[in-house]
Amino acid sequence: MSNKNEALLRRKARVRRALKATANGRPRLSVFRSSKQIYVQVIDDAVGRTLAAASSLDKDLKASLKTGADKAAAEAVGKLVAERAKAAGVTKVVFDRSGYIFHGRVKALADAAREGGLDF
């Protein structure tokens, strides 16, 4: 494994450990970012169940997006996951950036989810 991937895994584990300490039973808004798409899930760790999910591959979004890997796509995914989470009865979450730096696409997704009504 490369040093870059090992560093990402270490950061991811550190972020998850901190989240578990402060979650207080709230679901986790987990982000995965690839080079071509962005994915997000609202996960209830107590039950081990996904409550809501969205990605730039969703049929609702894919036609309207130029690419799945830019800030505009991240904003659209953030708004969509906020709608779906509220429909599932979730408003308070903890943000799991999965070891990614809170900048660019990850920040755009978080800001859009906040605008959509999620509280974190």
Curated annotation (Swiss-Prot):
Disulfide bonds: none
Tree of life domain: Bacteria
InterPro entries in the cross-refs: Ribosomal_uL18_bac-type, Ribosomal_uL18_bac/euk
GO MF annotation terms: 5S rRNA binding; structural constituent of ribosome
Gene Ontology CC, one term: cytosolic large ribosomal subunit
Keyword vocabulary terms for this entry: Ribonucleoprotein, Ribosomal protein, RNA-binding, rRNA-binding
GO biological process, one term: translation
Pfam name, any one: Ribosomal_L18p
Gene3D superfamilies given in the database record: 3.30.420.100
UniProt key word Aminoacyl-tRNA synthetase: no
NCBIfam families linked: L18_bact
Role description: This is one of the proteins that bind and probably mediate the attachment of the 5S RNA into the large ribosomal subunit, where it forms part of the central protuberance.
Subunit structure: Part of the 50S ribosomal subunit; part of the 5S rRNA/L5/L18/L25 subcomplex. Contacts the 5S and 23S rRNAs.
Stated family: Belongs to the universal ribosomal protein uL18 family.
Protein name: Large ribosomal subunit protein uL18
